[in-house]
Amino acid sequence: MSNFFVALHRLRAFYSPLGGDGDPAKSFILDMDTSDEQDLPLKPLEVGRLTNVQLEARGQGVLILGNLHLRWSRRGVGHYIVGGDRLVDPQTREEVGVYFNPGDLKPPLNVYFSGARELEGFEAYPLFRSVHAPSLLFTDPRLEVGQFYTGAKISELIKEKIMTHLKELGFTKDQLVMNGISMGTYPALKYGAELSAHAIIVSKPITNLGYVALRGRLHRPDEFDTIFDIDSQLTKKLSIADLNMIDQTFWEDFTECDLTNTKLFIAYMKDDDYDNLAYHDLSNNRAVKKARQFIYKGFPGRHNDDPEVVSWFVSRLKELMQNDFGRKG
């Protein structure tokens, strides 16, 4: 809420049975002064219901609305799923979700960032559970399909969460593996480089968020317009110069990272209609040229044309688990 002088502002929730109007008197006022999730006191019924939420405000000025999330309650034992957690920016109330599986408590710690998702949830849970090593899964529920895990406070919270679990497990950065597919490659590469992880494994990398927006009209018409909402969170204007500055800033920061002890595994689409520069920029980056290892494979087609690019990702993960950490299977 910005520049809004109000005598009253609140959220009111009330429910009604399917096919009925319900009773507006039976409503619940939601506390807008907290970033904590709030439980609606609803009892189980055999028939379906609709929950309606209305914003009540009185005053003059500008009102800014964000996403409203409706989830099953876990009764104090987690968010999203049992054991899940929320990392919340206290100023904007934006959040990302995280789930930690301690596995067998032996190295490494696998960190995975979910790709673009309309439904809230964690990707790759079965895959990393089958590895048996500790894993930390992230999901970004912001905007329509996620926001590439960007934002100064969100970035800080994500890295703090990773380092906290490394410390609790008694691991070092040499026992940290960062993973991501598509939208998840941006944070895997960015935070993996900043933390000097042992390895970074990504499939279908997207690193140039400004460039993705610039080529949308000709290369990807009427698809993924959400990129303009995402970029507007990173820059005040969406001019060509401002969009180019987003990517320039990413690569300037990336180049300053120390990758001398980091292995990189990159699977990319040769005709990617989102970011066809990511592999080129990575392979020519000064920090990557000093990396301990840089392995890559290109697949013909656009971003979502060939599922083999994901199979290659899984194969490299299992190969790394066996060769570097003695894990078989």
Summary of predicted features, one role per range:
Residues 1-77:
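Beta-strand-enriched, solvent-exposed domains that form extended recognition/catalytic surfaces
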Residues 82-133, 137-142, 266:
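Short, surface-exposed "cap/lid" segments of acyl-processing enzymes
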Residues 110, 121-123, 128-130, 134-149, ...:
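Patatin-like phospholipase
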Residues 149-171:
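Alpha/beta-hydrolase active-site loop
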Residues 170-182:
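Alpha/beta-hydrolase fold nucleophile elbow
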Residues 180-192:
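Glycine-rich nucleophile elbow surrounding the catalytic serine of serine-hydrolase chemistry
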Residues 194-234:
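Hydrolase active-site cap/lid region
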Residues 220-295, 301-326:
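The feature captures the conserved acid-bearing segment of alpha/beta-hydrolase catalytic domains
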